[in-house]
């Protein structure tokens, strides 16, 4: 647990800390800073650059150099409980490891922990052998051990090393081991008791700093990991030995000298015994090609519960050097010391159960590994032992078999290997133990690894050579994959394959991949079986973990290098090449399609211009144009089409005279409505062939003369309508109802709503009536695209004006810019104030426009009307359609639906000016010609509609497009006339 480094609270907390520090300064010489820093395992900054962090078994202590011996601490559960309370109090005061008060309190608590005496040297004779005469322990052995119990224990107690590969694994019990045995025997002999809740320490206090020192339990991983790889301990086993179950309440561990603060700290007391036992068991190399021989139960039906070595290989001692047997009368010093310690508890060897004998044998295998320290050089030897253990963990040479586990007496064996092992065990037991001399300093020898790196190894040890081992892996979509998620995934996988979670070892994460190995299990499942089963239950694993499993399989790893996975389904190089070629072909095809589309569009524009050039009949260019202009001059005195006096023509205007051949009285008040037409052919018009040809010739000359067209457009831009005030639209309450501030309705020509029916209690809407020839009945209503807060006003205008046709000339969104808000429901019905709009149908007529049908209902009066919307899609905001044909077909479709109606047509785009004015101009001119009006002054018609709404037809291109569309329609009418 890391103490937070936050400052102490204000007020009395800081003053109390200063007062306590002053009291401590007076009671301890040197002040607070004289205390050696504790907690360097939790905070690396405590030690200076001249100090190293020494592993004291608890918090770590800063020390200059590593040559001093550290005493062994006897840490029990009450000690841990007290330290836990002290840490809580310090943390509640806002203290951190850097505070002097924290260091002083921790130092005082550390001094209260009992120490173990360092091992004393044995009296030795000149020959270096243990005196033949047994000491007091031998007398106790003769007094308290029956003759029949000694052989039984001899099979369980560790023997002297046969091959010399591991010094100390079978050494006689030293005084230090006798010191360590009493607490261990308490775990062994006393019945297990449930821990008291008050005495159980919280794992969260020490959890971030307590992890395995050497990475894995089976010894396949070295102390160095590849970059990006984080290892976790194997999952807890289903059953643990009896003495391990109480390791959390009582623990013995030595404060052996450690490494600098950069190295990982040591394990907690509860984990030390379990990790040490598993480390001993992991020293047996697991050769995949050899068969595993599980241990057989002891005679009498009792099995070794919690035996961690069950399922491991039993390897013979072939190839080991046999020592000559010693005299049989030499007593076993190990038996003497064990009997002496047991006698102190009033227990004799024959009273121990087989399970206790097995556990005691395992304990004695563990103790020599920590007792190879001499009093004078404890620190250096401890570091060497750590280095030796790490090298042993990194990999065993398969050619050098490890020492076997002590077998049970009377266990039936069915192979010559186990018989030979028992023979050599008995031979080693009768050999007189040699006196343990001072351990020599290990010599480091450079050896070449398969990867070409020099690695130090211990002189006198067999050279290690890592072998390629297979690892199972599960690749997920989470990068990097957290350790908790990986462990959770393996736990769920263990449930699905009916395995114990402890069967998974060497758990690591490499980016998004989880790697693991499998112990020998009851189901005899291999790595391939487990990974295959993981693929079968992939959906269940993903559902329970929230991860997406991308791949499972088996791979290999060498000397902490990154795992090289072998995918289950590898992609052939030819397939990759084909996929690349297909992708390139797709990109090339897309580019070609875009190029073709651009060419087609450009060709369509050019074709339209060429078609306009060929509209008129041959030989009728100059003469017909002159005759048509002369006819127009003859009717200058007639009544104007727009019921207003015509002024003198402007000098800059070309052919601005407006005339008509027919009498003005022919137009009735109800004849303003459009004449129906067909999409295939134009309507039959009251136009003779000669008049039509003259109109075409005039239009052709008008379009070919670019200077005349430019001057005409300049004159239109300079035209100002009278009156032209827009005060109502610019009012404070109405300005937010305008989509564009430059296109507002005139005060004298605007649609007025009924105030009593309006949700905003206002009669304003940005809409203008467009009158063709009858002021009492407008032919069009030009309006802007509704805003989100003016949709109800829009439907009120539709209802009050009696409109049944809506012409929409803009998409809702163009180039990421909203052009118009959706004022109709996507499906079903929507209520806008008191008007319920129900979408009946939506028919895509072609790629350029679609048609929608609505029911419009007034929920107050329960009256219902039908309504049709024509939506043109291919008209850009600032431009013109690519061709006039789609718009002319669209207009014919609108007029066919509008046949016989006497209500205005609502026309809108985004701003209600550019595209709206162009469509109204084209439709108005063509409707006049269809009714027999023999005049074709499009400029004068545009001035007429601009008198009623400003900004109609915003650009010269739109004006030229209107001229072209009129010429196209006239040409189509002439072709439809009988010759």
UniProtKB/Swiss-Prot annotation:
Residues 400-409 have a biased composition (Pro residues). Disulfide bonds join 53-62. Residues 113-127 have a biased composition (Basic and acidic residues). Residues 652-677 have a biased composition (Low complexity). GO terms for cellular component: axon terminus; endosome; Golgi apparatus; neuronal cell body; nucleus; perikaryon; plasma membrane; secretory granule. GO terms for biological process: dense core granule maturation; insulin secretion involved in cellular response to glucose stimulus; luteinization; positive regulation of transcription by RNA polymerase II; positive regulation of type B pancreatic cell proliferation; regulation of secretion; response to reactive oxygen species. Residues 113-171, 248-272, 285-332, 391-466, 643-680 are annotated as: Disordered. SMART domains: PTPc (SM00194), PTPc_motif (SM00404), RESP18 (SM01305). Keywords: Cell membrane, Cell projection, Cytoplasmic vesicle, Disulfide bond, Endosome, Glycoprotein, Isopeptide bond, Membrane, Nucleus, Phosphoprotein, Receptor, Signal, Synapse, Transcription, Transcription regulation, Transmembrane, Transmembrane helix, Ubl conjugation. Glycans are attached at residues 506, 524. The record marks 448-449 as: Cleavage. One of its GO terms (molecular function) is ubiquitin-like protein ligase binding. Residues 709-969 form the Tyrosine-protein phosphatase domain. There is a cross-link at residue 754 (Glycyl lysine isopeptide (Lys-Gly) (interchain with G-Cter in SUMO)). Its main location: membrane. Residues 35-131 are annotated as: RESP18 homology domain. Residues 35-575 are lumenal. Residues 1-34 form the signal peptide. N-glycosylated. Homodimer; shown for the unprocessed protein (proICA512) in the endoplasmic reticulum and resolved during protein maturation as ICA512-TMF seems to be predominantly monomeric in secretory granules; however, ICA512-CCF interacts with ICA512-TMF disrupting the ICA512-TMF:SNTB2 complex. The isolated lumenal RESP18 homology domain has been shown to form disulfide-linked homooligomers. Interacts (via cytoplasmic domain) with phosphorylated SNTB2; this protects PTPRN against cleavage by CAPN1 to produce ICA512-CCF. Plays a role in vesicle-mediated secretory processes. Required for normal accumulation of secretory vesicles in hippocampus, pituitary and pancreatic islets. Required for the accumulation of normal levels of insulin-containing vesicles and preventing their degradation. Plays a role in insulin secretion in response to glucose stimuli. Required for normal accumulation of the neurotransmitters norepinephrine, dopamine and serotonin in the brain. Belongs to the protein-tyrosine phosphatase family. Receptor class 8 subfamily. This is Receptor-type tyrosine-protein phosphatase-like N. It comes from Bos taurus (Bovine).
